Regions:
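Sec-dependent signal peptide recognition
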Residues: 2-9
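Hydrophobic h-region of N-terminal signal peptides that target proteins for export
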Residues: 10-19
């Protein structure tokens, strides 16, 4: 009898865990929170956003249905789907309930700057750190924080209200890798990877600096800052090989990301289906694309960089700009407002590395025969000019 009870308990635990297929550190979605969106979107608009932006290539078909007057999306296993009633047409749609406002001026615009990664003592763990010989280390987290502080000043001078998701290298999350070993084991098994001391350490660290940290920032953005726009600031990189002996590359490029392009595998997770619905229904996409297109144009002009081109199926080109792509990332998925996600400069490009060694400076210096601002001020100018072009048009 004891063995039977034990077997039944294990079976119940398996069924519970299986029914709640969630990505690492996610909580069960509150599907009822989407009820406020009933009647706020037409069938045509929902179909466009779902099938062309968020789940292209038929990725949506296993989990969503679209009928004449409603759509459904699968929730937890064994539970009824969430049903969304469509508006009769766009003209008769109810107002969209959301915290962000589609303002048309930089003055009064609420902007949250999200300097990617952490930097500081965490930079090596994040693998966003490299050093050539005795030169100054290149640390993305510290570099984008410097950009954010310069950018904050410039945007505030133009009347925007600006906040930062972090103002130091201190993590927003209270979790640390040693508290994430259980989730790390589950994550490794979900990926079909072996669990050993090295993989467990690496995955627990990844869940700390990427997953837990981004989720903590999203909680701050959505619950406290409630901006009209998030600017996610990053530098890009190509593989630099052996961390002990990194190599420089001749490649250098620019691209910007908006939320979209979920795969069928990603949509097998209940929380990702919920996140897609929340993002789609608050109508971030068109604003994200429009602002990203304007910023991409000014960044391309400021940086003189060609567009990066995705060759796989993890991203789709959108907005009529070769620089703007839709991709499903945790940050642009969880922030419940338009997000412009910037990826300029390849950090381990030789010229970029040399410019980082120069640090910040006023005026211009000769860089390969061209007078250039510091890489930080060039970044800031590209962003500011793009925002001015869009919001003050």
């Amino acid at each position: 009898m004891t063995l039977v009870r034990t077997a039944l308990a294990l079976l119940a635990l398996y069924v519970c865990v299986h029914a709640q297929k969630l990505t690492p550190l996610a909580t069960r979605p509150d599907w009822a929170s989407l009820e406020k969106f009933q009647g706020t979107i037409s069938k045509e608009e929902f179909n466009r956003l779902l099938t062309q932006v968020y789940a292209p290539g038929g990725a949506w078909q296993e989990y969503f249905t679209i009928a004449e007057d409603h759509a459904t999306v699968a929730t937890g296993e064994g539970e009824p789907p969430f049903r969304l009633e469509f508006a009769p047409d766009a003209a008769n749609a109810k107002p969209v309930p959301r915290y962000w406002q589609p303002r048309n001026s930089l003055r009064g615009l609420r902007i949250a700057l999200d300097p990617g990664h952490l930097g500081g003592e965490w930079a090596k763990m994040e693998e966003r750190w490299f050093q050539i010989g005795n030169n100054k280390p290149v640390t993305e987290g510290d570099m984008v924080l410097y950009v954010a502080k310069l950018l904050k000043s410039e945007l505030e001078r133009r009347g925007a209200s600006v906040s930062l998701t972090r103002s130091s290298s201190k993590p927003a999350t209270n979790l640390r890798p040693d508290k994430l070993k259980g989730p790390a084991v589950r994550s490794l098994r979900d990926q079909g990877r072996s669990v050993n001391p090295a993989s467990l350490k690496s995955e627990a660290e990844r869940l700390f600096y990427r997953t837990a940290e981004i989720r903590a920032r999203a909680k701050k953005v959505n619950g406290q800052l409630k901006p009209d726009l998030v600017l996610a600031l990053h530098f890009n990189a190509e593989s630099w090989g052996n961390p002990a002996r990194p190599t420089l590359t001749g490649l250098n490029h620019l691209h910007l990301l908006v939320s979209g392009c979920y795969s069928a595998r990603e949509l097998s997770y209940e929380d990702q289906r919920y996140d897609l619905m929340a993002k789609l229904l608050n109508r971030s996409y068109d604003k994200e694309v429009a602002v990203s297109r304007a910023v991409a144009q000014s960044m391309a002009r400021a940086t003189r960089l060609p567009p990066y081109n995705y060759t796989g199926d993890s991203a789709i080109n959108v907005g009529g700009s070769p620089y703007v792509w839709a991709r499903n990332l945790l940050a642009n998925r969880l922030f419940e407002c338009p997000v412009v996600y910037l990826e300029p400069y390849v950090m381990n490009n030789k010229e970029v590395h040399d410019r980082v060694q120069l640090g910040d400076y006023s005026g211009r210096r000769n860089i390969n025969g061209i007078p250039r601002e510091s890489i930080y001020r060039e970044y800031v100018r590209g962003v500011v000019e793009g925002l001015e072009a869009y919001y003050n048009r």
